[in-house]
Amino acid sequence: MNFETTIGLEVHVELKTKSKMFSPSPVTYGQEPNTQTNVIDWGFPGVLPSINRGAYQLGIMVGLALHADITRLTHFDRKNYFYPDNPKAYQITQSEKPLGTNGWVEIEVDGKKKKIGIAELHVEEDAGKNQHEDDGYSYVDLNRQGTPLVEIVSKPDITSPEEAYAYLETLRQIVQFTGASDVKMEEGSMRVDTNLSVRPIGQEHFGIKTEIKNLNSFVHVRDGLAFEEKRQQAVLLSGGEVRQETRRWDPDAKETLLMRVKEGADDYRYFPEPDLPPVAVSQKWIDDIQASLPQPPAERRQRYIEDWGIPAYDAGVLTQTKEMSDFFEATVAQGADAKQASNWLMGEVSGFLNAQHVELGQVALTPAHLAGMIKLIGDGTISSKMAKKVFKEIIQHDTDPDKWVHEKGLIQLSDPAKLTPIIDEILDNNQQSIDDFKAGKDRAIGFLVGQIMKQTHGQANPKVVNQILMAEIKQR
């Protein structure tokens, strides 16, 4: 029996605002517990929320970037439930009329492109955080309570764990490029809820779905879904029935574990939020936001390939983040060769950032200085080997590469009039190497070049050295 898989993803993205969705409390990651709150977050009687217009605008920005239809007149709803991290006993969200509907993203898996539909996007407030400690007590931190979120709900178009991974990566890139969110799973600004069901091919109705929790990375999402897919198939093949469950991914055991069985759908008793007015979105507001959106990563990738001849893989790496993409474009705008700029960013720059665990904006390197160094290589002022010394300087200090090269005497020696006497001296002292080369031992030329580079402290231009060396050997 063959099966088909259906996967649904609900992605919560934390919007990058200075204050919360319905209160003036600050939004700052990593602060002491319960220091970023006020009476609205705590749900004190008589206090009234107010809508953060900036947060809603960021939500519209995300919706437009995902090709969604923006709802022109909507309202907020109360989702009623009790939990320690929700002191109001309800969450303000959008149920009946979400911010946007009918969006889509295009993914690519194994060279094949596919559109994944987005059913809806809605803006809501986040809950606080329960912390279970070793002393036997559970504590509540409400710093996160009220943080603005946009929830992105996929249509049932995802049919494999690989597609789910590609969808999340594409979604992360698109949202990150808008600037609406940092979308960092490690900081909680992007969280994923998943559900999966399988059914025999040809069956009209969907199978029974299970939810999977504790998915803290895209790799965990992919691996957890892959395990659950096989588990459900095995249950059906053995004649059993899949139960509606919530399961937890164990990354060490590489399996999902039962948390609880769900007997029916949750009843949150939604009703319109009485303390907030409706939200009217004008066409001008939508148009202004649309005009402010940057070129999306997919279009940038294609432009890099077509306009600058960047290989497809490299173009994909350069557009992983808007910061890297903008830096690359700015470097080229400063006159650097596009392929050389790409190579340096993907190689030495990325290597340094990964080794130091920092981001591009946290180092001293500027597009102008990187372009300046690439020009010095291109015109022969410095060698590729010297460039690595220059790079270490300009990525750690705000240093002009041209000025620094001249101050340190690192200019490449390319003048034949200065190189020829040095080469002649080396040849005079190494007749055996000349004889070996003429006898067909090509490695002898490498020895001679090495001696010349040693004599010039690595500053001789290897290309010019080889030209003079071959000419001099022929005359001997």
Curated annotation (Swiss-Prot):
Reaction(s) catalysed by this chain's protein: L-glutamyl-tRNA(Gln) + L-glutamine + ATP + H2O = L-glutaminyl-tRNA(Gln) + L-glutamate + ADP + phosphate + H(+); L-aspartyl-tRNA(Asn) + L-glutamine + ATP + H2O = L-asparaginyl-tRNA(Asn) + L-glutamate + ADP + phosphate + 2 H(+)
Enzyme Commission code(s) on record: 6.3.5.-
GO biological process entries: glutaminyl-tRNAGln biosynthesis via transamidation; translation
UniProt cross-references to InterPro entries, sorted A to Z: Asn/Gln-tRNA_amidoTrfase_suB/E, Asn/Gln-tRNA_Trfase_suB/E_cat, Asn/Gln_amidotransferase, Asn/Gln_tRNA_amidoTrase-B-like, GatB, GatB_C_1, GatB_Yqey_C_2, Gln-tRNA_amidoTrfase_suB_CS
A Pfam family annotated for this UniProt entry: GatB_N
SMART domains: GatB_Yqey (SM00845)
The UniProt record lists the keyword Hydrolase: no
GO MF term list: asparaginyl-tRNA synthase (glutamine-hydrolyzing) activity; ATP binding; glutaminyl-tRNA synthase (glutamine-hydrolyzing) activity
Keywords: ATP-binding, Ligase, Nucleotide-binding, Protein biosynthesis
Family membership noted in the UniProt record: Belongs to the GatB/GatE family. GatB subfamily.
Role, per record: Allows the formation of correctly charged Asn-tRNA(Asn) or Gln-tRNA(Gln) through the transamidation of misacylated Asp-tRNA(Asn) or Glu-tRNA(Gln) in organisms which lack either or both of asparaginyl-tRNA or glutaminyl-tRNA synthetases. The reaction takes place in the presence of glutamine and ATP through an activated phospho-Asp-tRNA(Asn) or phospho-Glu-tRNA(Gln).
Subunit annotation: Heterotrimer of A, B and C subunits.
Official protein name in the record: Aspartyl/glutamyl-tRNA(Asn/Gln) amidotransferase subunit B
Native source species: Lacticaseibacillus paracasei (strain ATCC 334 / BCRC 17002 / CCUG 31169 / CIP 107868 / KCTC 3260 / NRRL B-441) (Lactobacillus paracasei)
Lineage of producing organism: Bacteria, Bacillati, Bacillota, Bacilli, Lactobacillales
